[in-house]
């Protein structure tokens, strides 16, 4: 018996078959996407990860047995087609394949959980329930190919700039920033939590002498938000740098974003075309507005915002309409930022914290961090937190902690921006929110 892997071994992907191969024999493997039986001729569209190939079966040119094999094709069945390439202006890529052999690799059951041709639209929940099939649609898989390129570029950028990749625990004994947005779990006979952020570990790494570190990993927040931009499990890109100011950190973040956009523009044109989305690639430095300037902008548009308040949804919308594209917000009030954020040396009520925004969407938060043990200890107390809960973290600040800065960025939100997705669930393979824990 012929080995199944030998049977389905292709010579080309669909996007590699063009008019230049006319007259040649090719072998393609994929899923039956669509079937049109016009009586004297049958068209079968075969889909693989790179596109669609058309099988054309004219009854006058093929045996009855071959026509029977073609007509037996069932949607989403995997087949391997061997045949001759023939030019056809109406077919995908300008060619069709006249079959000489068809091998059925695996037959699909019917009915299908959703329509991969998208002639029948499916609700988001239906799509997520059958995510494996949802990703067979090229506009859906395009999002994850772009996300893959984004993460690949991010890693390359960090490696090129002398960063060391780290992996930090996701099971932790206490909150990173305090608060109640924690998922408690039972850790043998102790209470533990899923990590909100690698922040404390990144800072501890600054005491090791590695200077620059980054991590790409999951974070968990027990937020009850049920919005198009929040999830309870998310992917975060984090960086921390010794002997670098918040301005240096902002420059690193901007450089990374621009390199990601450039690489995606170069390497993902087909995917962007599948999404019918045009990249927004800034050529100028990202604008910077202070927190106080944000208040003036928001209030001038009849949305109330007072000093010491975070941006609410109405304020974000107004700011996004005013600023457009990518921009930084700086000089946030110290009182509303985490305990580890360094106050401004000129005015302690203002901090060194910054946010990177894209229109009305927050992408990243960062700051210069406090490196002085006594100041850090007092800031923990000022936030009504117990320093004893941070004993191991604080220890790293007793023996020569360098001044340092860093940031964390939501990779899923950045994917939304790059792909034009309106719902963050579109950018995560198996999203987790308050209503969804499967698949």
UniProtKB/Swiss-Prot annotation:
Keyword Iron belongs to the record: no
Site positions for Important for tRNA non-discrimination: 92
Binding positions for Mg(2+) 2 per the UniProt entry: 362, 365
Record: residues binding Mg(2+) 3: 362
Pfam families: tRNA-synt_2 (PF00152), tRNA_anti-codon (PF01336)
CDD domains reported in the protein's UniProt record: AsxRS_core, ND_PkAspRS_like_N
Coiled-coil region list: none
Enzyme class (EC, first level): ligase
Cofactor note: Binds 3 Mg(2+) cations per subunit. The strongest magnesium site (Mg1) is bound to the beta- and gamma-phosphates of ATP and four water molecules complete its coordination sphere.
Keywords: Aminoacyl-tRNA synthetase, ATP-binding, Cytoplasm, Ligase, Magnesium, Metal-binding, Nucleotide-binding, Protein biosynthesis
UniProt-recorded Gene Ontology molecular function terms: aspartate-tRNA ligase activity; aspartate-tRNA(Asn) ligase activity; ATP binding; magnesium ion binding; RNA binding
Matches recorded under PROSITE patterns: AA_TRNA_LIGASE_II (PS50862)
GO-annotated biological processes: aspartyl-tRNA aminoacylation
Location in the cell: Cytoplasm
Family of the protein in this entry: Belongs to the class-II aminoacyl-tRNA synthetase family. Type 2 subfamily.
Quaternary data: Homodimer.
Protein role: Aspartyl-tRNA synthetase with relaxed tRNA specificity since it is able to aspartylate not only its cognate tRNA(Asp) but also tRNA(Asn). Reaction proceeds in two steps: L-aspartate is first activated by ATP to form Asp-AMP and then transferred to the acceptor end of tRNA(Asp/Asn).
Protein name (record): Aspartate--tRNA(Asp/Asn) ligase
């Amino acid at each position: 018996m012929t080995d199944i892997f030998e049977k389905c071994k292709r010579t080309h992907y669909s996007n590699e078959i063009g008019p230049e191969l006319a007259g040649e024999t090719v072998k393609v493997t994929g899923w039956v996407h669509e079937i049109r039986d016009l009586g004297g001729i049958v068209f079968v569209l075969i889909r693989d990860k790179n596109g669609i190939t058309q099988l054309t079966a004219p009854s006058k040119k093929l045996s009855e047995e071959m026509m029977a094999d073609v007509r037996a094709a069932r949607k989403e069945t995997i087949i391997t087609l061997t045949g001759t390439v023939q030019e056809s202006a109406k077919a995908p890529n300008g060619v069709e394949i006249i079959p000489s052999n068809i091998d059925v690799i695996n037959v699909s059951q019917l009915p299908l959980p959703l329509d991969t041709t998208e002639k029948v639209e499916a609700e988001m929940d239906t799509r997520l329930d059958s995510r494996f099939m949802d990703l067979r649609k090229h506009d859906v898989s395009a999002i994850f190919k772009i996300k893959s390129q984004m993460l690949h570029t991010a890693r390359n950028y960090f490696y090129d700039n002398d960063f060391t990749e780290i992996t930090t625990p996701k099971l932790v004994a206490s909150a990173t920033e305090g608060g109640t947005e924690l998922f408690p779990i039972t850790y043998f006979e102790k209470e533990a939590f899923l990590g909100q952020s690698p922040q404390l570990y990144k800072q501890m790494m600054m005491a090791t002498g590695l200077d620059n570190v980054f991590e790409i990993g999951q974070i968990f927040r027990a937020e009850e938000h049920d919005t198009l931009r929040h999830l309870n499990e998310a992917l975060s890109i984090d960086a921390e740098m010794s002997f670098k100011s918040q301005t240096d950190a902002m420059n690193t973040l901007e450089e990374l974003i621009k390199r990601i956009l450039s690489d995606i523009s170069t390497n993902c044109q087909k995917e962007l075309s599948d999404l019918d989305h045009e990249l927004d690639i800034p050529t100028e430095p990202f604008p910077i507005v202070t927190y106080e300037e944000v208040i003036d902008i928001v209030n001038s548009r009849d949305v109330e915002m007072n000093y010491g308040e975070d941006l609410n949804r109405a304020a974000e919308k107004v700011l996004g309409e005013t600023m457009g594209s990518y921009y930084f917000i700086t000089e946030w009030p110290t009182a509303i930022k985490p305990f580890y954020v360094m106050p401004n040396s000129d005015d302690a009520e203002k901090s060194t914290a910054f946010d990177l925004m894209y229109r009305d969407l927050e992408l990243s938060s960062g700051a210069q961090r406090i490196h002085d043990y006594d100041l850090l200890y007092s800031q923990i107390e000022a936030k009504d937190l117990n320093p004893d809960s941070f004993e191991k973290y604080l220890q790293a600040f007793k023996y020569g902690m360098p001044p340092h800065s860093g940031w964390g960025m939501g990779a899923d939100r950045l994917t939304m921006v790059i792909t034009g997705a309106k719902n963050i669930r579109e950018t995560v393979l198996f999203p987790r929110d308050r209503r969804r824990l499967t698949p």
